[in-house]
């Protein structure tokens, strides 16, 4: 909205300096600042409200150190979603379908997460929303995104081919596997972020780094000069994804204002599922989905720790008559908690690991 207002003022009155509104970098910075300020200033009011009604109990199976923490208000993801929506709509172009697809994903999975949180903290239903209904929501979103991008001519480049990290001239044409791939990535990434959301500031910090990186890739993808130089797919309109990505990244940073240890609020499934779906859809739209195992490596490690733990436990119970574990507890961050690591140290180290994954993903632009 502000974009169109400033554009109108520039076209009609031509005041000096207003032409910067046409620059992606300016609007991305403005969206980032707007999102950060909204989160910081709205946060205290939302926390005060949620404390009265939406307190999530500590899980019985949590590590001993985790059970010592006071019960916190959940559904903090509503703050993240609100700041993204406002800043995104203020600074993005409404005629760009990329923007609407990302916002749809955030609202879609945010709603499913909200229902899950509501059932847990208000209706006192242990486990919240049944896993099968979450899966139905994730698969449905994947089908909507996949089918829309497959049949809409504006997205014709999306399903045709994608570049492969570390290989200069290697491309993949997904063909009929494109839609199943979209469903898988959206489901996998949203679940991965949800699994990672277990310590103060962990999921929000890691998500912020990953989305910031994707915003940089989106900017390069939407610029013909950079895309040609770096030998990546040029996608017209991907620059708008960079703007929304900066809004998402800074909403995570703003949320850390209240979610860093000791947390005043947690994002709940409302936030983790919304952020996970946003990461997945952004990567798919800018054709960097094959880079996700590197860029989002922290989420991958957390997910693998759970998968390996469950698989090994079932195998050893079948083979030896008793279940055995690889980790003290899964996901991985709880393993380190039980090893005696301080919560703050675990979170900071996971952030550092995520930054290393980020830098490695940048290297793939030239290591081909």
Curated annotation (Swiss-Prot):
It catalyses: UDP-N-acetyl-alpha-D-muramoyl-L-alanyl-gamma-D-glutamyl-meso-2,6-diaminopimeloyl-D-alanyl-D-alanine + di-trans,octa-cis-undecaprenyl phosphate = di-trans,octa-cis-undecaprenyl diphospho-N-acetyl-alpha-D-muramoyl-L-alanyl-D-glutamyl-meso-2,6-diaminopimeloyl-D-alanyl-D-alanine + UMP. Its EC number is 2.7.8.13. The chain crosses the membrane at residues 30-50, 72-92, 98-118, 135-155, 170-190, 201-221, 238-258, 265-285, 290-310, 345-365. Pathway: Cell wall biogenesis; peptidoglycan biosynthesis. GO terms for biological process: cell division; cell wall organization; peptidoglycan biosynthetic process; regulation of cell shape. Keywords: Cell cycle, Cell division, Cell inner membrane, Cell membrane, Cell shape, Cell wall biogenesis/degradation, Magnesium, Membrane, Metal-binding, Peptidoglycan synthesis, Transferase, Transmembrane, Transmembrane helix. The keyword Transmembrane applies. It is a multi-pass membrane protein. One of its GO terms (molecular function) is metal ion binding. One of its GO terms (cellular component) is plasma membrane. CDD domains: GT_MraY. Its cofactor is Mg(2+). It is found in: Cell inner membrane. The keyword Protease does not apply. NCBIfam families: mraY. Catalyzes the initial step of the lipid cycle reactions in the biosynthesis of the cell wall peptidoglycan: transfers peptidoglycan precursor phospho-MurNAc-pentapeptide from UDP-MurNAc-pentapeptide onto the lipid carrier undecaprenyl phosphate, yielding undecaprenyl-pyrophosphoryl-MurNAc-pentapeptide, known as lipid I. Belongs to the glycosyltransferase 4 family. MraY subfamily. PANTHER family: PHOSPHO-N-ACETYLMURAMOYL-PENTAPEPTIDE-TRANSFERASE, PHOSPHO-N-ACETYLMURAMOYL-PENTAPEPTIDE-TRANSFERASE HOMOLOG. This is Phospho-N-acetylmuramoyl-pentapeptide-transferase.
